[in-house]
Swiss-Prot record:
Pathway connected to this protein: Porphyrin-containing compound metabolism; protoporphyrin-IX biosynthesis; 5-aminolevulinate from L-glutamyl-tRNA(Glu): step 1/2
Gene3D superfamilies to which the protein is assigned, alphabetical: Glutamyl-tRNA reductase, N-terminal domain, NAD(P)-binding Rossmann-like Domain
UniProt record, GO biological process: chlorophyll biosynthetic process; protoporphyrinogen IX biosynthetic process from glutamate
Originating species: Chlorobaculum parvum (strain DSM 263 / NCIMB 8327)
Protein name stated in the entry: Glutamyl-tRNA reductase
Length: 426
């Protein structure tokens, strides 16, 4: 009984290799189904994202090892001309479990503490469960991984603090204004960065978001997605600057789109009510002199990156706590695996002694009263429990390596002359 894992991720392979190995959901279902239906695996699951494609497999045949699985997925993806075995990592036994726990808890992510990965692992398990390739081992492994992720989220601060520019901008605005639901927001630029910032704002209860963009249809599409349906023509948005408490700029331009003179006029109309300008452009969208104006808080990408660096430093400080949680869960999972491996021997041992007990009691069934027979059954049950206590305890006891399990199982089976067990869980 073994769970092995091979795969490529952001640590082992560049993006052009990861792209060649990635599986769509349809391919994922087909791949794990083929592995199990062919008998190559008794259980199989694949986690496939933009940063990783990882196989988690319970082999069904002796020849199915890490090298075999690497070759199998390379062939499946017809990628022999680009992908080599050295692009993959290998994991075995508890190493496989530790790796999935680290992935699920987001300490193996490209961005430390990035919470999206847990949902992707859950999707991988859902796919395997739907097609019937997640059996007792992968089911227990995945649910333990989900438990690890939950404990990491509730017991540590690993996922706290912004680690993207767009989210850091929104977090900063919330720190300054506290309640964003009462503030009016202008987003200048509806590209990827602007869209992320707007969605983060919306998630923080900012509902009064107005969008302007050179291509108005793009602004309208984002406004509709957010449910604000509020758009300003790009040619005239400067006439309304004084109306906004928060201005986010995220456009591609070589010249400043906002200068000090324009913002000074806007502040006069606002009677110096504070304004935050979050400049997410590169090159910068806003003249740095704007930041010198009274009650004008200007933050550019460098200022936001400083916040991100501090947050990442805080996240890294949480790693010992996270690893302690993983170690704790790994011990429990390893003990469960060991118990599963020795369970057939424990059942056989108990069955043999019960059979001996019943045969001996049968000899006296017609020689003693019903009451005496019950007392004899009770007495022999207690004796058997005490006799079997130590062998069963020894079988269940943790071992240093999985290789030691067969030796102690064989010892017990030989001592008590037990027949060979069913090999399905060995």
């Amino acid at each position: 009984m073994n769970i092995i894992s091979v795969g490529v991720n952001h640590k082992t392979a560049p993006i052009e290799i990861r792209e060649r190995i990635a599986l769509s959901e349809v391919q994922n279902k087909e791949f794990v189904t083929d592995l199990v239906s062919s008998g190559l695996a008794s259980e199989a699951m694949v986690v496939s994202t933009c940063n990783r494609t990882e196989l988690y497999v319970v082999p069904g045949m002796p020849e199915v090892n890490c090298d075999y699985l690497k070759d199998y997925i390379i062939s499946y993806k017809d990628a022999r001309n680009a992908v080599r075995p050295e692009h993959f990592f290998n994991r075995f036994y508890c190493g496989t479990a530790r790796h999935l726990f680290e992935v699920s808890s987001a300490i193996d992510s490209l961005v430390l503490g990035e919470g999206q990965i847990l949902g992707q692992v859950k999707d991988a398990y859902r796919i395997a469960a739907e097609v019937g390739t997640a059996g007792i081992l992968l089911t227990r492994l995945c649910h333990t991984a989900f438990s690890v992720a939950k404990k990491v989220k509730t017991r540590t601060k690993l996922m706290e603090g912004a680690v993207s520019v767009s989210y850091a901008a929104v977090e900063l605005a919330q720190k300054i204004f506290s309640n964003l639901s009462m503030k009016k927001v202008l987003l200048i630029g509806a590209g990827e960065t602007g869209e992320l910032a707007a969605k983060h704002m919306y998630a923080k209860n900012a509902r009064n978001i107005v969008i302007t963009n050179r291509t108005q249809s793009k602004a309208e599409a984002l406004a509709e997605e957010l449910g604000t349906n509020r758009v300003l023509p790009y040619e005239s948005y400067k006439e309304h600057l004084h109306e906004f408490d928060i201005i986010i700029t995220a456009v591609s331009t070589k010249e400043y789109i906002l200068n000090a003179a324009e913002m000074q006029q806007s502040m006069a109309k606002r009677r110096l009510k504070p304004v935050i300008i979050l400049d997410l452009g590169l090159p910068r969208n806003v003249d740095p002199e704007v930041g010198a104006l009274q009650n004008m808080f200007l933050k550019d990408i460098d200022a936001l990156k400083h916040i991100i660096d501090k947050n990442l430093e805080r996240r890294r400080a949480e790693l010992p706590k996270v690893k302690s949680i993983i170690d704790e869960e790994l011990i429990g999972f390893g003990q469960w695996i060991n118990t599963l491996k020795v369970r057939p021997t424990i059942v056989d041992l108990q069955s043999k002694f019960i059979e001996i007990k019943e045969k001996e009691l049968e000899r006296y069934r017609h020689k003693v009263s019903e009451e005496e027979l019950k007392r004899m059954e009770h007495l022999t049950d207690r004796i058997l429990k005490k006799i079997l206590h130590h062998p069963i305890k020894m079988l269940k006891a943790p071992v240093d390596t999985a290789d030691n399990i067969p030796s102690k199982v064989n010892l017990v089976r030989n001592i008590f002359d037990l027949e060979e067990p069913n090999q399905s869980l060995q």
